[in-house]
Amino acid sequence: MTQFQGVKGTRDIFPDEISRWHYVEGVVHSVAALYGFSEIRTPVFEYTELFQRGIGATTDIVGKEMFTFLPDPNGRSLTLRPEMTAGVMRACLQKNLLSQAPVHKLWYISDLFRKERPQAGRQRQFTQFGAELLGVSNPAAVAEVLTLMMQVFETLGLHGLRLRINSLGDLDDRARYREALRAYFQPYEADLDELSKERLKKNPLRILDSKNPALQEMIMGAPRLYHSLKPESVAEFEQVLAYLDDRQIAYNVDHLLVRGLDYYCHTAFEVTSSELGAQDAIGGGGRYDGLARELGASADLPAVGFAVGMERLMIVMEKQGLFATLNPHGPLVSVIIQQKELAGHAMQVAFHLRKAGIKTEIDLAERSMKAQMRDANRMGSAYALFVGQSEFESGIYALKNLVTSEQTSLDLDAIIEVLREPAARESLRP
């Protein structure tokens, strides 16, 4: 019989790696709480038209990368979410949250799905963390989510990241810019690749996103969106930059940055790392005031957010040695069964230790004491608690420090007090 393999573009995360995920997730949770953001969770699939309207029909995500499957009983096709923002906005509009409070600050850590060519840091099922701030049009809202994102990176110890930022203006600004780009690229249409020719017809801003080396010189000569902005759009962008200056957040203004989703307006940004090679983006985001109207609201809703790829982030952390000091502890104590017939009593001892909040391991396979001790050392247990006939009869147990080899005999209540002491945890081993 053929052995099953995981689906291409997916990966398994085993216990020896999961501590890294827990660490990063914990930092995201704690920093988001500092800024007053609350967690939101949305369904893993939505109606396909949510993404077609929300992300944009001309984007690569909608055109080529969505996992869409058979219609539901009502005849509407469903899609595994390729990004979070459209689903979060749908949830907030459906719940009518903005009528309950004028501002909502939300964060998430969620799995997403795209039909991409699998490679390092780019999977078909992947995880992002992000934040969305709804209801504030002031440039301070952009600075707020940007600062939150950069504080997560700082707390994780990342260095050498580059923040690129640009203004995409409003609808009128972008309409003028699209015409300027068409006028610029049309004389070179024969030199464009097939994808860029298609983008020239549908949305020439997407050409600026091309990674084709043969087009980079042409792209560098393209008109800049900044020159199509009205004075109000320029003033708003400069205010965002002033907030970043006040907070000493370094950035590079990149007037060719457009991002890959059609819902962005005004400020857009991206964070990159040279550790990732050509596909160097860790995350990004921006304003998306028009998304609510696209999804059925009666008016625009000021909103700004970001998303960061967890797998890519963790590749950078690994390359920068940031997991070297992460010490996932083993059990505080391993209960060692000296005689098989005492296994039931030993399990009761382990039960009471765990009820007391003490991380405890016990052998369930009726192996020898030697094998149990070998496992205790392999797992990094700080202590071994021995259960034999004399311990069973007297209620006094031998407790051995596996780091110092010191041993003492105490009743279970006294052992619990010892193991609760901060000094006991100093013996924890990686």
Curated annotation (Swiss-Prot):
It comes from the Bacteria. Its main location: cytoplasm. InterPro entries: aa-tRNA-synth_II (IPR006195), aa-tRNA-synth_II/BPL/LPL (IPR045864), Anticodon-bd (IPR004154), Anticodon-bd_dom_sf (IPR036621), His-tRNA-ligase (IPR015807), HisRS-like_core (IPR041715), HisRS/HisZ (IPR004516), HisRS_anticodon (IPR033656). It holds the Pfam family tRNA-synt_His. PROSITE patterns: AA_TRNA_LIGASE_II. It is found in: Cytoplasm. It is an enzyme of class 6 (ligase). It catalyses: tRNA(His) + L-histidine + ATP = L-histidyl-tRNA(His) + AMP + diphosphate + H(+). GO terms for biological process: histidyl-tRNA aminoacylation. One of its GO terms (molecular function) is ATP binding. Signal peptide: none annotated. One of its GO terms (cellular component) is cytoplasm. Keywords: Aminoacyl-tRNA synthetase, ATP-binding, Cytoplasm, Ligase, Nucleotide-binding, Protein biosynthesis. Its EC number is 6.1.1.21. Belongs to the class-II aminoacyl-tRNA synthetase family. Homodimer. This is Histidine--tRNA ligase. It comes from Chlorobaculum tepidum (strain ATCC 49652 / DSM 12025 / NBRC 103806 / TLS) (Chlorobium tepidum).
